[in-house]
């Protein structure tokens, strides 16, 4: 199937090869007339090109990749190549797996068949999309892209699809390849060349791009790349092919010069994810890197927070270089060194290529500059870590195991005989006792779909994940299903405890990153620090990362996080109301000021909801609360005491207040009643068990006073008009996943509703961290911090100070947290409150003012 151009374009000559014709194409005997073709047509037209101006055809006649090499398909591909040669396009757009395999079979290889790739062929469209490569035996310039049908299935790829279509249209204006000449003469330098290069950088102080290869293990950095432009750079090998590259005295001189350059605050530096370079250099080699002025990952994230942020993606969008990241694992020494050279020069080019677009969005530029200023204290926290009390941690683990044993006894007493009769039980050893395994998918499937008789989803099949079990529990309220869910949650808690792995110095670390969420929130994951994993014989099996996500540490476990010694206090300060202030300002701007007035009066909306709920439960009119004067309402909410400890059912005594807070946040973001019920159930390990109807009452009462639904409607209108959300803090997000401006998908709407509150809260917290870090009065004569930050948790900071600095530190914390925002014309200063104690959990002593 082929369609030749009927309206030749005066400058562009593009051939488009799809995967294979679908039903609509076969019915009409015309390429690209189905839904995927319509998506392609829209994107081409947006770039000034019509499908009638292109050669349109397919790489295969069928969807099967398994029959690729049979005689019929081979004959078809010969015909295809002949047609392309005859048309002689300036560029060929390869859409999807079949097209890439037809143009570059050398890039494809056999692998083990999987559900995602049943043919057993690995065709790396994900890697090569956006790349400009020679194809069809080198005769034609090609651009690789996802097929429009794949994009429709995974619509999060629409942003990359748009970029790649634009690239193909641009490249169809000329036969020329856009490759740039780069001087890689110094990827395996001599000692003299290395010293000359480093000396010149030290003395002339050019802006440099930095990239390291290696890990913070027993070897450390294996090669260190430095570029002085997008075209020139040096790669300094240290450990190549299992051996040292330099003599000992030579390496000492090189490291000394490198350390001088890296610590020089007058030498501007850029990187792709500077946090890794800083951590490995400081942790493994005790080398400080100062004055990172740019970061290609952070800049790219600022412009397109929804897109992948790895260097492969960054290079594919901001340069015209083809995919190269697989060269990292090559066994060829020169290719491996060349890979590091590409990293540093491509990073340099990509970072500078973003400047024109960044200049077009001044607020985004300001936010990016702020994040670059924030990077040093983030790196400090990544390195510093926090002391962990191992005895307390063990006590928590023992308690969790005991509770899990209790759940197991309850489950086995009800299910064991039936499960045994159904022959679904397994055990590792014959000597092991029989037990129902709540980790086993097979056994949970039996429980849900055989024993309890639920009907599997027609679309997803017999799933057993947490949300599925919660959904069935919502329907049945079956007590044994609840116990199984509680056991699963307790296993998760136990796993969380086991992930709190310390480094040899007794401190736990995390890896904070500014670019891992779509809302500019700090992300936390396992630390970049590594320790050896030993086998039974005492030999090192491999090196593994320590630490974990510390933002999800439960309140119960926070007593394990302690200051360095008894001479220090642990402190925490968090924003009061946090995300709610942005919602309140939005509603006030829309003409619904109740929430903002409450916040300004020091009234917490969750406490107001508790009062309204009490009226409802007493069968009185909850609207009475809404009619109260603001001062009377403040007296009532101030008199509400939130209990501590556990109630008679084992629930947190504050569960009702927690439910009101969950209702506030979920309803602000267009969450539904069942979402609130599920959140509370999960957080409490099944102890707080509101029905959907009960959660709906909470929501109804909340809306009765604050009207958050009108903010949701306004956000939907903004998305329909612009497709973007601009936050007061400067962060901007374009929602590529919107299929139409006429309709906003509910999930996108919920994401957009939470975006600015989370971004603003994070921004204000980060402002406090920046104020703390750069305040000269917070430094000793040696440069050490009087008030140290250890942890960042969305709307809070925590750390330590010496007890002698307690009064001074309290005043300073309040000062650092005083930051103003203008949200839709309304000036807002989010108040902060906190305390200090002998652990993170016990920061209950009020901060002095």
Regions flagged by a language model, labelled:
Residues 1-177:
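A polyanion-binding, active-site-adjacent surface
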Residues 397-426, 430-431, 435-437, 698-715, ...:
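Polymerase palm active-site segment centered on the conserved acidic dipeptide of motif C
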Residues 76, 80-88, 197-200, 248-267:
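Short, basic/hydrophobic alpha-helical segments
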Residues 90-97, 209, 266-274, 572:
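Acidic beta-strand-to-loop metal/phosphate-binding motif
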Residues 376-379, 383, 455, 505, ...:
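Conserved catalytic core of nucleic-acid polymerases
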Residues 51-52, 293-295, 392, 429-433, ...:
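Short Gly/Ser/Thr- and Asp/Glu-enriched loop/turn motifs at secondary-structure junctions
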Residues 170-244, 318, 326, 332-336, ...:
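Conserved "right-hand" nucleotidyltransferase catalytic core of DNA-directed polymerases
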Residues 140-143, 149, 172-189, 222-225, ...:
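Active-site-proximal helix-loop-helix substrate-binding element of RNase H-like nuclease domains
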